[in-house]
Each structure stands twice: as C-alpha cells, then as structure tokens.
Swiss-Prot record:
Mg(2+) binds at residue 260. It comes from Cereibacter sphaeroides (strain ATCC 17023 / DSM 158 / JCM 6121 / CCUG 31486 / LMG 2827 / NBRC 12203 / NCIMB 8253 / ATH 2.4.1.) (Rhodobacter sphaeroides). Keywords: Aminoacyl-tRNA synthetase, ATP-binding, Cytoplasm, Ligase, Magnesium, Metal-binding, Nucleotide-binding, Protein biosynthesis. This is Phenylalanine--tRNA ligase alpha subunit. HAMAP family: Phe_tRNA_synth_alpha1. It is found in: Cytoplasm.
Length: 360
C-alpha cells in the first residue's frame, strides 16, 4: 500500500465518521485546505523529476477529486438527514382551511352605474359619453341657461383659464352630463334614447356634496312622447333599482332652464330603525329632476321642435347609491379607505342583470 493509498483511506474514513457539517468542514480543511496534506503534497511536485511528477501528479489529482466528491456527497447526506429529523418533529394538519387571498371589490358607484345601465338597456336606452371639459356653449348656452343664471357664476362652476389675450369664453368642468345629450342629438338626430352617466363638477363640499360627483341623465326623443311616458320610465326604473314590487312617485312642479314643463320627483318611503324603506310609509324623498325637453334645447341640437319632442331626467348616482345601500356620508366615496371599500364593495364577478338580480 502506497502513501497515497494510506492517505486516501484516512480521509475517506474521516469523512464517513463526520457527524455534522462542522466536523466535515474540519476534514476538508485538513485534506484540501491551503495547509492540508493533499495540498502540501501537490506543492512538492515541483521538486520531483519529470517522470515522477507525471505519475505522482496524476495520482494526486485523482485523490483530490475523490476526496472532494466524497465531501460533497457526505454534506448532502447530512443535510438530508437534518431535514428528515426536522420533518419528524413537525406536523401539518391538512384539513385546515387555506389562507384567504384578499380580493378587490367593485366600488359602489361603479356597481350602481352597472345597475342603472342594465335597467335602462332593458328599456331600449343606449349609453352615451362625452368630454368632462366642456365649452361654455355645450354646458350652458345649448341648454337654454342664460348668462345671468347663478350656475354660470364662478362660485358655482370650475372655469378653465384661457391663455393671456384669448377673449373666447372659457371652458368649464362640466356641471352636469346634459352636454352629452346635446352631442348625442347632433350626432344621431331623432328618434333617440340615451343615458349619460359620468363625473360632473361643482364648487360644493359638505356631508352630502363634493366638488366632484357622479350623475346620470336620460333623454328620449320621438314624435308622440309625453309626460306619461316619462312617468312610466321613472317608475319602472325605481321599482327595478330599489328591488321592490311597486313604487309611488310624486311629481312637483319646478323650473329647469332645459325642460318645460319641469318636475322634481319624490318617492314614497319610510324610516324604520334608521333604515330607509322604499315604496311604503307616509314619507316622501326627493330623488331626481325631470321634464319635457325645452324646444330651444332641441333646436340648439339640430332637432326640429315642431316635429319632435321628448323628456329628460337627471339624478345623482352617488345619492341613489347612498339611499339603496345605507351609506351615510358622501365624502367617504372618494377617500379610498380600504376598510370602507371592503364593507360596501361588491364582488368583482357579480355583474348586475335583471334576470339574476341587480344586487346579490
């Protein structure tokens, strides 16, 4: 047996006997470290003759590779043994439920927009959209709102500044979605049935008002449309939206520049234990404004008022969401509070439809 065979047997035995990774590291350093026995013998090759160097060098390389492979194998074996020992001391109850993954929710405003879109689509209304930054003409003039009207003052409307020297009327952040109706009539003519949901802007801020809120307005133009048609549409909408078998509406004479005659609409309701009940009781709650489209508005949109007539209505989406789902403060709609959204939000896959139920 040569000296290298003796060295090999010594370290193979030491590797096999190493009880943990620390002991195995000591063996590695003793054999292959900078001052290890095999490393020192590799340095002695320079003092040998060429023939001895070739023979001994090859043998040392084989020994080094074998020891290194044995060290790696033993290290993996120790790691596997440690894992087995740890697993034997641990246990997992596979019957435990999994951790729920936090899912997002649909905002009440988005939900209500989808609900009212489904209801009016069932009555033949299409959805129309328009810009949120409007010209003075579309937002006011075309809707028969005179220059002296309070809504055209700076304390009520957000005006967009023009460049210095530009004397044209300023653009505004639209104060209602009625300009969309003008654009729809200009583009499609008559007859037409559209609703226009979207964001609107007014200078107001309290528990029931915010500078930005959501509104939906409806428009129907045909040759024989009357207030009776308006009443039926609004009753059907309220019955479907509030998910009650019947509703009673009260029309109160009012004044809006863009409709004539005009009416504010109240719905019969009651309050029981702080909860609003629609369709019963002795109370009345205002929910929207409506009326027959003013002939000047039809003419401004390019529709002949001698041939066509129609009705229009408008309501606050945030307001009817508050009424239906018992939300006390309008400002919370825009605060991005995750706790609030999880409480009042809706499951992403619960898309409202009349057959399956608007809210589930």
């Amino acid at each position: 047996m040569t000296a290298l065979d003796t060295l090999r047997g010594k370290y193979i035995e030491a590797i096999s006997s190493a009880a943990d990774e620390a002991a195995l590291e000591e063996v590695r350093l003793a054999a292959l470290g900078k001052k290890g026995e095999i490393s020192l013998k590799m340095r002695e090759l320079g003092q040998m003759s060429p023939e001895e160097r070739q023979t001994t060098g090859a043998a040392l390389n084989r020994l080094r590779d074998e020891i290194d492979a044995s060290l790696r194998a033993r290290k993996q074996g120790l790691a596997d043994a440690a894992l087995d020992a740890r697993l034997k001391t641990e246990w997992l109850d596979v019957t435990l439920p999994g951790r729920p993954r936090r899912a997002g929710t649909i905002h009440p405003v988005s939900q209500v927009m989808a609900e009212l879109t489904a209801i009016f689509a069932d009555m033949g209304f299409a959805v129309a959209e328009g810009p949120q930054v409007e010209s003075d003409w579309f937002n006011f003039d075309a809707l028969n709102i005179p220059p002296e009207h309070p809504a055209r003052q700076e304390h009520d409307t957000f005006f967009m500044a023009r460049a210095e020297g530009d004397d044209r009327p300023p653009h505004v952040l639209r104060t209602h979605t009625s300009p969309v109706q003008i654009r729809a009539m200009q583009a499609q003519g008559a007859p037409i049935r559209v609703i226009a949901p979207g964001r609107v802007y007014r200078m107001d801020m309290d528990q029931t008002h915010t500078p930005m809120f959501h509104q939906v307005e409806g428009l129907a133009i045909d040759r024989d449309i009357s207030m009776a048609n308006l009443k039926w549409v609004l009753e059907e909408f309220c019955r479907a939206f509030f998910e009650v078998p019947s509703v009673e509406l009260r029309f109160r004479a009012s004044h809006f520049p863009f409709t004539e005659p005009s009416a504010e609409v109240d719905i019969r309701c009651s309050w029981e234990g702080g909860q609003l009940r629609i369709g019963e009781g002795d109370g009345w709650l205002e929910i929207l404004g409506s009326g027959m489209v003013h002939p000047k508005v039809l003419a401004a949109a390019g529709v002949n008022p001698d041939e066509w007539q129609g009705f229009a209505f408008g309501m606050g989406i945030d307001r009817i969401a508050m009424l239906k789902y018992g939300i006390p403060d309008l400002r919370a709609f825009f605060e991005s509070d995750l706790r609030w959204l999880r409480h009042y939000g809706f499951a992403a896959l619960d898309m409202p439809d009349l057959a399956g139920g608007l809210s589930r």
